[in-house]
């Protein structure tokens, strides 16, 4: 994602998501957004930790029970899908999912590095 972030500026909104842990790449992304003047939104199930202070907007989707052995990510995924659908509805010119799927189909699958 270095290529996509190279032009990051104050007009951008960065959406980051983290569940249970605080991955270093997410922290780096939030710091980069702040340095470039972009607005950052963090979607997470934790109100405290190293990531929330780095975000301009914090969206918390707590698990049903923090004590459960297997916590669900359903709430986080629902909010993420709602945000992406809302952006696509307001800015149809930013829709890329169909184009990405066309590339995957043309290449015969996903390419990983």
Regions found by a protein language model. Give the residues of each.
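Glycine-rich phosphate-binding loops that contact phosphosugars or nucleotide phosphates
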Residues: 1-90
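Internal, active-site/partner-interface "lid" segment
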Residues: 90-113
């Amino acid at each position: 994602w270095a290529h996509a972030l190279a032009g990051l500026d104050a007009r951008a909104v960065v959406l980051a998501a983290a569940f249970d842990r605080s991955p270093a790449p997410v922290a780096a992304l939030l710091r980069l957004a702040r340095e470039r003047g972009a607005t950052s939104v963090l979607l997470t199930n934790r109100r405290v930790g190293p990531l929330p202070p780095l975000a301009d907007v914090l969206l918390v989707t707590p698990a049903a029970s923090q004590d459960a052995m297997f916590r669900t990510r359903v709430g986080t995924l629902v909010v993420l899908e709602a945000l992406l659908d809302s952006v696509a509805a307001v800015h149809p010119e930013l829709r890329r999912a169909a184009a990405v799927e066309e590339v995957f189909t043309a290449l015969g699958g996903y390419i990983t590095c």
